[in-house]
């Protein structure tokens, strides 16, 4: 049953669409300027790991895990990116609210990842917009315990406005080795409609994907400067893509979790 509200006929509908695009563009520009140093450091860390034949790991819970999928087995992306998918923390579970329950549950993520073979010299990227729940904090702490460099991709505006829900008493940005602020607002959504109190249309996925792909591009440039061929996937829908990718995957089989 839909909820009836008084009709509001003052909308410029196209302006709402334009507003979202403008919000994204403005925030991308702001991130590009304000996070330049952090992204450069992240690119150096990725390049260092790949130079030494180490892996890049990535984790996010629920919708934050979309960026895990975005970096893994991706045309134009790095082959040695190993995903951390924790049961119950991906968007294919039913009921979907289970993701929120388990992300907040102290000890759940820590128990789920204790056999993940992160090694010293690896890089671990943990994505959480609010950064307040137990799961991303526990994954980040595990990565540090294992000797990896831990990068937090989060919203400082959002995270600093909320209390931690982890028994550690910490938020993600407080436990990572490097913090990249994605520029998303508190609550993530950015379009405000007249007559409707709740903002709509989140931005963190777009901002986060742009940040990570930009870091990968710079890391590949660093590898080339060092005389190292970047291990990058070709689209499987281009001629020769399957063969190219098979060679890359054989190199990392047994180390990258999805292989």
Model region roles, listed by residue range:
Residues 11-12:
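Short, positively charged and aromatic/hydrophobic N-terminal segments
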Residues 15-19, 51, 56:
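N-terminal glycine-rich anion-binding loops that anchor highly charged ligand groups
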Residues 15-34:
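Generic N-terminal amphipathic, Lys/Arg-enriched alpha-helix
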Residues 34-51, 112:
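A short, well-structured juxtamembrane/interface segment
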Residues 38, 42, 76-79, 221-259:
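Active-site phosphate/pyrophosphate-binding segments
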Residues 57-216:
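Glycine-rich phosphate-binding loops that contact phosphosugars or nucleotide phosphates
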């Amino acid at each position: 049953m839909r909820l009836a509200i008084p009709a509001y006929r003052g909308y410029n509908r196209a302006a709402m669409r334009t507003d979202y695009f403008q919000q994204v563009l403005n925030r991308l520009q702001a991130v590009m300027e304000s996070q330049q140093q952090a992204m450069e450091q992240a690119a150096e860390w990725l390049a260092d790991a790949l130079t030494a034949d180490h892996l890049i790991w990535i984790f996010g819970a629920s919708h934050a895990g979309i960026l895990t999928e975005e970096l893994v087995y991706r045309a134009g992306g790095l082959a040695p990116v190993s995903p951390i998918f924790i049961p119950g923390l991906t968007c294919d579970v039913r009921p979907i609210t289970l993701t929120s329950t388990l992300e907040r549950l102290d000890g759940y993520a820590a128990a789920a990842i204790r056999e993940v073979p992160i090694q010293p010299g690896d890089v671990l990227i943990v994505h959480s917009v609010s950064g307040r729940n137990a799961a991303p904090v526990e994954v980040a702490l595990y990565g540090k315990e294992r000797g990896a460099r831990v990068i937090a991709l989060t919203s400082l505006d959002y995270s600093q406005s909320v209390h931690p829900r982890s028994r550690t008493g910490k938020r993600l940005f407080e436990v990572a080795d490097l913090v990249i602020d994605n520029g998303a607002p508190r609550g993530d959504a950015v379009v405000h409609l007249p007559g409707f109190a709740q903002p709509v249309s989140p931005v963190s996925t777009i901002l986060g994907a742009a940040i990570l792909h930009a870091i990968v591009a710079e890391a590949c440039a660093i590898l080339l400067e060092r005389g190292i061929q970047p291990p990058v996937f070709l689209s499987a829908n281009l001629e020769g893509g399957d063969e190219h990718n098979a060679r890359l995957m054989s190199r990392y089989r047994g180390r990258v979790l999805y292989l």
